[in-house]
Amino acid sequence: MRSAQVYRWQIPMDAGVVLRDRRLKTRDGLYVCLRDGEREGWGEISPLPGFSQETWEEAQTALLTWVNDWLQGSEGLPEMPSVAFGASCALAELTGVLPEAADYRAAPLCTGDPDDLVLRLADMPGEKIAKVKVGLYEAVRDGMVVNVLLEAIPDLHLRLDANRAWTPLKAQQFAKYVNPDYRARIAFLEEPCKTRDDSRAFARETGIAIAWDESLREADFTFEAEEGVRAVVIKPTLTGSLDKVREQVAAAHALGLTAVISSSIESSLGLTQLARIAAWLTPGTLPGLDTLHLMQAQQIRPWPGSALPCLKREELERLL
């Protein structure tokens, strides 16, 4: 016997979270809980403003329609990426497809003061990998910060994310301030330039490896082995169903590329599922999931070791 619940939620964000020139004051989303007999599965649907094609309201309408169809015996999935991902996660939990084992390691995210990152990395066991957002300030400043970090911590490898912020000139200004001896310890730089061709040229000219992120969601993108391209960053909330995520990981691995499962600032419930997906599909690769500290609360399932309060399902607004 099938049954389902849908919850709507809103989590206050820390001050200072900016996405594509928009301040994100709250993280808004939905949960679906599917039941079939004794089994239960949860999924999170939280379109990311400025990045997702669909709005929260559109996702809610699509989710409620899909849930009602599922209750009637339908086996299909919704079209919208965030809804397809959340629904497929709920089904994967319900059927036991999604393993419980999780990779709760996360590459620490530095959005501001590099000194904070140095302190966090000092306590990090094993491989030291961190992520730094670049492109928010002057390219020269970004280059200097990256150089300081690589100089201060000799065993550090950095993942950088520019979100296509730079012109070729700005990208070259950044590279100019990174010591050529340190560039090999930049694991990759996500989408440095506004176009793929400019990003490819940057990689060739500087020796700094790049990764595709936004490109994966463009209609003309194909997986290819290319000089200077080392990785793909997969954000499941923006990608679609779990099957589509698995296809992209497999395509990347077939070409010898690193595939990194990455957060779209999901709640703790969604992040714990991403940690399980990472352990399952990309074992041995550190996922990019260090976004919980941007929020003021957790929900339903806590992230191990987090001191943030965790809300229970009874405290959420139920829609169905």
Swiss-Prot record:
Q: Which residues bind Mg(2+)?
A: 161, 190, 213
What is the enzyme's class at the highest EC level? Answer: lyase
The UniProt entry, under HAMAP family, shows: MenC_1
- Biological processes per GO annotation: menaquinone biosynthetic process
* UniProt keyword annotation of Metal-binding present: yes
Native species: Salmonella heidelberg (strain SL476)
- Kindly give the PANTHER family that the UniProt entry links to this protein: O-SUCCINYLBENZOATE SYNTHASE, O-SUCCINYLBENZOATE SYNTHASE-RELATED
At the top level of its lineage, which domain of life is listed? Answer: Bacteria
Alphabetically, the GO molecular function entries are: magnesium ion binding; O-succinylbenzoate synthase activity
Q: Where is the active site?
A: 133, 235
**Which protein is depicted?**
o-succinylbenzoate synthase
**Role:** Converts 2-succinyl-6-hydroxy-2,4-cyclohexadiene-1-carboxylate (SHCHC) to 2-succinylbenzoate (OSB).
Gene name tied to this protein:
menC
Q: Which InterPro entries match?
A: Enolase-like_C_sf, Enolase-like_N, Enolase_C-like, Mandelate_racemase_C, OSB_synthase_MenC1, OSBS_N
Per UniProt, which keywords does this protein have?
Answer: Lyase, Magnesium, Menaquinone biosynthesis, Metal-binding
Identify the EC number(s): 4.2.1.113
Cofactor(s) the record lists: a divalent metal cation
